[in-house]
Regions:
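Short glycine- and hydrophobic/aromatic-rich loop-to-beta-strand nucleating segment
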Residues: 18-22, 175-177
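Alpha-to-beta junction loops
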Residues: 55-58, 128-137
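Extracytoplasmic/periplasmic substrate-recognition and gating elements
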Residues: 28-33, 106-107, 146-210
Length: 218
């Protein structure tokens, strides 16, 4: 399990990785080489500039740099000081990274929706052909295949953008029990049932995610 402050406790359920999806048809249209998928932040922002120069109403993506991963992979080393009394991500690397997103947004390489877009809105824009790239999940491809078959035919999958060469990005989901639960024993039994190795694997196969249970990768 995973302990949290003040005695809260959660049972690990599944983990997910986040690749970057690219619309190769739009890449060609906007002057990019589909055989050279951007992998670093310099390459990513250079692609954005190329899109702005060659296409109208087409954008690089909705990523705005506010995720911790977008800062850490650009060189930010820490987010808080040792006693957790002050944020520290406004260092040189953090300011540079956020500034690059702001500049690309002002140029028109990032859509207005990016300021308050949800995950589903980003997928909608990508499926409609307004975005050249999208930071997605392993299961996103199934949605593209079902909802946007033309996009799926022109889909390329690249690593998460990173300056450190570490493209894997594992996000995990847990099941926890509310302290105010009227039936905590039943809730705990249910959480254990859902997260046991057998049921994790069955769920993960259908959802295109990865098990957290020991031995589940087999």
């Amino acid at each position: 399990g995973n302990g949290i402050e003040k005695g809260a406790y959660g049972l690990p359920w599944y983990v997910n990785d986040g690749p970057t999806y690219w619309n190769t048809e739009l890449m060609q249209k906007c002057g990019l080489d589909p055989n050279k998928i951007p992998t670093t932040w310099d390459e990513y922002f250079a692609a954005g500039d190329t899109i702005v120069q060659n296409c109208k109403d087409v954008y690089l993506g909705t990523t705005m740099g506010y995720n911790t991963e977008d800062l850490m992979t650009a060189g930010v080393k820490s987010f808080m000081n040792d006693d957790h009394s002050k944020y520290t991500f406004n260092d040189e690397a953090g300011v540079k990274q956020i500034s690059r997103f702001v500049e690309l947004y002002k140029k028109g390489g990032i859509p207005p929706e990016a300021l308050d877009s949800s995950w589903s809105q980003a997928a909608d824009l990508f499926q409609r052909g307004n975005l050249v790239s999208m930071a997605g999940s392993a299961y996103s491809a199934d949605g593209f295949k079902q909802n946007a078959p033309d996009l799926y035919k022109n889909l390329a999958v690249g690593p998460r953008i990173s300056n450190d060469g570490k493209s894997a990005s594992v996000a995990y989901e847990m099941l926890g029990i509310s302290a105010n639960s009227k039936h905590p024993d039943v809730a705990i039994d249910f959480a254990r049932f859902v997260t046991n190795e057998k049921n994790q694997i069955e769920f993960d196969k259908k959802a295109s995610v990865f098990p957290s249970a020991k031995g589940g990768s087999g």
